[in-house]
From Swiss-Prot:
Record's keyword annotation contains Lipoprotein: no
Pathways per UniProt: tRNA modification; tRNA-queuosine biosynthesis
Protein name: NADPH-dependent 7-cyano-7-deazaguanine reductase
Record lineage: Bacteria, Bacillati, Cyanobacteriota, Cyanophyceae, Oscillatoriophycideae
Function comment: Catalyzes the NADPH-dependent reduction of 7-cyano-7-deazaguanine (preQ0) to 7-aminomethyl-7-deazaguanine (preQ1).
Gene Ontology annotations for the cellular component aspect, listed alphabetically: cytoplasm
Length: 141
């Protein structure tokens, strides 16, 4: 390992130590799942996350939304604290409304492979414009 690599690792390590525990949890956050306790039973799970924030990739202004997730689980169910931390990881990202909701769908499907999922991002009005983005995924039969 050369001098620059060593300094970079030490810098990253010291920055991680300076972070508050919640910030570390968000940075390390990933969508964690557990086995569906009722495989074979078709039931719906609804999750509402009212504190979604990201930054506009054009202006840098914050955007605020409620993310609604409605899904029918397959073999895995998403763990609620993990999805909260995952959603919080968007807070400092420069990302459009459209891309954020589509990325959440992609990551959700990759993590728990639901039979069906619908994700809705209901963004607070900005500049007198109210945006709602809805995306869906259906598992191929």
């Amino acid at each position: 390992m050369n001098y620059d690599e060593t300094n970079n690792e030490l810098f990253q390590e010291s920055n991680m130590q300076e972070l508050k525990y919640g910030e570390r949890n968000i940075l390390e956050g990933e969508l964690i799942t557990f086995p569906n306790p009722r495989i074979g039973r078709r039931y719906e799970i609804n999750i509402s996350l009212p504190e979604f924030t990201c930054k506009c990739p054009f202006s840098g202004y914050p955007d605020f939304a409620t993310i609604h997730i409605k899904y029918i689980p397959n073999e895995r169910v998403v763990e609620l604290k993990a999805i909260k931390l995952y959603i919080n990881s968007y807070r400092e990202r420069y990302i459009s409304h459209e891309e954020s909701v589509n990325q959440i769908l992609d990551d959700f499907v990759a993590a728990c492979d639901p039979l069906e999922v619908k994700i809705k991002g209901d963004f607070l009005p900005r500049g007198n414009v109210h945006t709602t983005i809805e995306v869906e995924h259906y598992k191929a039969s």
